[in-house]
């Protein structure tokens, strides 16, 4: 049973690594304050799936 648990964990880690390889994330140089709405809107204009804040800088991914 212990072997299958380790195998499951390794498989999950590999899948996460593969998934994050295909998700492009870039900083677009926009400040997130006063709200994240501007960040999300600018990311969608640039054809990215979503926008998120890291610190006070907007990043786009997808």
Curated annotation (Swiss-Prot):
UniProt key word Nuclease: no
Q: Name one GO cellular component term.
A: extracellular region
Which cysteine pairs make disulfide bonds?
A: 32-53, 39-58, 43-60
Q: Where in the cell is it found?
A: Secreted
User: Which Gene Ontology terms cover its molecular function?
Assistant: toxin activity
Which tissues and organs express this gene's product? Expressed by the venom gland.
Keyword list (alphabetical) reads:
Disulfide bond, Neurotoxin, Secreted, Signal, Toxin
* Major location (coarse): secreted
Range of residues in the leader sequence: 1-25
Its annotated function is as follows: Neurotoxin. Decreases the action potential of myelinated nerves in mice and frogs.
User: What is the designated name of this protein?
Assistant: Venom protein 51.1
**Native source organism of the sequence:** Lychas mucronatus
The record lists the lineage as: Eukaryota, Metazoa, Ecdysozoa, Arthropoda, Chelicerata
């Amino acid at each position: 049973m212990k072997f299958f648990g380790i195998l499951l964990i390794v498989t999950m880690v590999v899948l996460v690594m593969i998934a994050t390889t295909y998700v492009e994330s870039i900083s677009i140089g926009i400040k997130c304050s006063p709200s994240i709405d501007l960040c999300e809107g600018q990311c969608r204009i640039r054809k990215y799936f979503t926008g998120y804040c890291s610190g006070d800088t907007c990043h786009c991914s997808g």
